[in-house]
Design a protein with these regions (language model features):
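Short, acidic (Asp/Glu-rich) active-site segment that either coordinates a divalent metal cofactor
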Residues: 1-18
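Glycine-/charge-enriched secondary-structure boundary and capping motifs
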Residues: 15-18, 28-30, 34-150
Length: 150
């Protein structure tokens, strides 16, 4: 995370070379996502390369005006899990989870269950944290302005 958006704004420093890009993995994963989309299996998708999972999920929630309930894996470092800008990684929204799982296994694409969308206007994390969609929108829309004014 030494060259991530998180590192830039939180620790105020960047360090080291960025990780090497695995172009084969990028292509394979991208083709998988497109194939699922073209076959009507994905309602929405967002890569996590700019800000990490939590930023991508927030953007999806704001665009769809939906909430979400997500599972924070036990033992996972919250900073890395929420803000790690992993390559070849996407958040997808689907109502056809079993078919996505089957296709990911056949294509040898790793898949993790993050949670589910919700009609509640909030992000609920399994560790007990809850933030309203209104507050997320405010943070998202004014965050850069606040950072630049400091």
């Amino acid at each position: 995370m030494s060259n991530s958006t998180y590192a830039k704004f939180i620790s105020k420093k960047l360090g080291g070379a960025p990780p090497l890009v695995d172009l084969n993995s990028e292509l394979k994963t991208g083709k998988f996502i497109l194939d699922c989309y073209h076959n009507g299996l994905i309602n929405a998708a967002h890569d996590i390369s700019d800000g990490g999972m939590l930023v991508a999920l927030t953007e999806m929630m704001l665009a769809g005006n939906n909430g979400a309930e997500i599972i924070h894996p036990e033992g996972a470092d919250p900073h890395c899990w929420f803000f790690g800008e992993n390559q070849s990684s996407y958040i997808i929204a689907t109502t056809k989870l079993k078919e996505i799982i089957k296709r990911s296994e056949n294509a040898n694409i790793p898949l993790s269950y993050l949670g589910r969308s919700s009609s509640a206007q909030e992000l609920k994390i399994s560790n007990g944290d809850i933030i309203s969609l209104k507050e997320l929108r405010n943070i998202y829309e004014t965050g850069l302005t606040k950072q630049l004014s400091q």
